[in-house]
Swiss-Prot record:
Entry coiled-coil feature ranges: none
Disulphide-bonded residues: none
Record key words, sorted: Plasmid
Matches recorded under Gene3D superfamilies: ph1033 like domains
Lineage, broadest ranks: Archaea, Methanobacteriati, Methanobacteriota, Methanomada group, Methanococci
Stored SUPFAM superfamilies: PUA domain-like
Family of this protein: Belongs to the UPF0310 family.
Name listed for the protein in its UniProt record: UPF0310 protein MJECL36
Presence of keyword Lipoprotein: no
Species of origin: Methanocaldococcus jannaschii (strain ATCC 43067 / DSM 2661 / JAL-1 / JCM 10045 / NBRC 100440) (Methanococcus jannaschii)
Membrane spanning stretches: none
Record bears the keyword Electron transport: no
């Protein structure tokens, strides 16, 4: 079993929560193809800057209940940079826990093993849709 931190925005978090589906862009096909039934996904919502500032949050934990499949139906909201993106590589999910209120990710940074550079922590997440994390970090986040 593997543990994954899945990076999304507020709009697509709502889709994940409602439809119980995680999807990634074509360019992340190789990453999602490593995901197996039974793996655990932690949903990380990116921070929002400016006047609508919101810190980064851990929103929920899900178990993967399907193999990776391709579906180009438009359920996720595309990013402004790629308005035609449909996040076609997907897995179906079973909810384990939704955090209400969400967990402030910045408070976890000092304790997380996978973040080796605590000052420039966002570099461990930038440019990724998802990344594998150690079981120890999964337990720290979920046990919070």
């Amino acid at each position: 079993m593997a543990y994954w931190l899945c990076i999304t925005n507020e709009d697509n978090w709502k889709v994940i929560k409602e439809k119980k589906i995680w999807g990634v862009a074509e360019r992340y096909k190789n990453t999602i193809n490593k995901v197996k039934v039974g793996d655990k996904l932690i949903i990380y919502e990116i921070q929002r800057s400016g006047k609508d500032y919101k810190p980064p949050y851990i929103r929920g934990v899900y178990e993967v209940v399907s193999e990776v499949y391709k579906d180009s139906s438009k359920i996720f909201k595309p990013t402004p940079r790629n308005p035609n993106e449909k996040f076609p590589y997907r897995v179906k999910l079973k909810e384990i826990k939704v955090f209400e209120p969400p967990i402030n990710f910045k408070e976890l940074i000092p304790k997380l093993k996978f973040i080796t550079n605590k000052k420039r922590w966002s570099g461990h997440l930038m440019g990724k849709a998802m990344r594998e994390i150690p079981e120890e970090d999964y337990k720290l986040i979920v046990g919070n």
